[in-house]
């Protein structure tokens, strides 16, 4: 009797331990649902597939799969045949048709309304309605799975410090072959910190950015109280100060706005802006100053056009115009540069007016994680003829005043950024940030890279060498993880083989683009009821939005209208750059990377 009782207890224990959905049996976005303790059922509804595991394509799906080119093939076509694309770009019907396909095919890969969060790996009202969570592209790995990645890989994940040191840490600066510059790097950091605002007091799965999109709270403040402290309440403008004839943000002392500065920073250098962390580096404060000037400039334009408007209407309409400018710059300059396409991307909300499209957005935790592009950062920051290491650069707004915005723009336009994919290019100064990114990913129980590749319609990697494109890091990965299906998302994105002469690998682009375009085009100003001249104060305001570019933003707000773009002016610089090619560890004694982590999100 005792033996039978023990066997029964063992059977019950085993049945409870083995969640049948841990193996991710349901393919092609089928939903796995447990049926008792040891059975599962795949819900294949509207996937285009059927069968026990949603693995058999329906007739129309089979045809689509036969005709559909691979993402790498599409990328090759879009980045070659420049003469053909010049013709396509000059024919509005063709350009509009292709752009519409780009927008719909990408944005339809994002669930809207949102589905999961870190605490709900099944659909629930809480996961839908609670805006304080980041949503999830894939549900978290269940707590009762035998390994951290479900059923694949080792029982314990490798030490995150080992992962960083062996695979991610820079040995020597690797410049980006696409010619990405520091104007791009700081734009990316400034732009994304309006919606990547992790609430670390509650945990990495929570956000303080409740707008979940492009609302410019990094300019105006997340709360009404912060906004009011930053506003002048005259002619719609934001508070400012004039130093040597140039407009800069006001100080913390003058606004009583909470900012993060070390105690030793002089009061006159503690500038106050919408995002509390933007005092961290002068590159962020550069963009904060440019957008402050742009807001007040737009207010002047609207005031002349509408002398009858009060302060509130001037402020609110200027904010909508700046949102429009931001989205246009991001699509037509920022994403255009990242893509490397000869096809010219276009910001035109009307392309989606006859499509099924939801004008809402929820930021996904995975989008936040994949955007940790710390390899962009150089070893030192070159401004005019001076170089600054990290210790000299951090929390040092005096550099901005000393050099001025014109020199900043000219210098950052010339300075090349690092390559993100390919591994071993995270600067030593931010290695603790990279480690924290891995640790937080584990807290959120992300599935493996291959599961995310399947989620975004990519073929899973079959070997470590296929992932990295070389042997040394592939061997390190295998020693750390044991199974290609158990490699973590964040490290994999950074060690992935880059596309030819590109900044990213396939996974980063094919995952990031849907999140990005859905977030941009899902903004309310892109909806039919908003996208009209009256929303922006008439044709004058509408024109500001429709003619915006990174160059016009700089020309309108920086003395001398210095040339700028998101890539270094001379493509040959990517071959010959030596500014940052020194061995990174040679100046480690000058760097205090922990200052980046203390009391704030690792997103920086």
From Swiss-Prot:
Highest expression in kidney and urinary bladder. It catalyses: (5Z,8Z,11Z,14Z)-eicosatetraenoate + AH2 + 2 O2 = prostaglandin H2 + A + H2O; (5Z,8Z,11Z,14Z)-eicosatetraenoate + 2 O2 = prostaglandin G2; prostaglandin G2 + AH2 = prostaglandin H2 + A + H2O; (5Z,8Z,11Z,14Z,17Z)-eicosapentaenoate + 2 O2 = prostaglandin G3. Substrate binds at residues 106, 341. It is found in: Microsome membrane; Endoplasmic reticulum membrane; Nucleus inner membrane; Nucleus outer membrane. PROSITE patterns: EGF_3, PEROXIDASE_3. It is a peripheral membrane protein. Its cofactor is heme b. Homodimer. This is Prostaglandin G/H synthase 2.
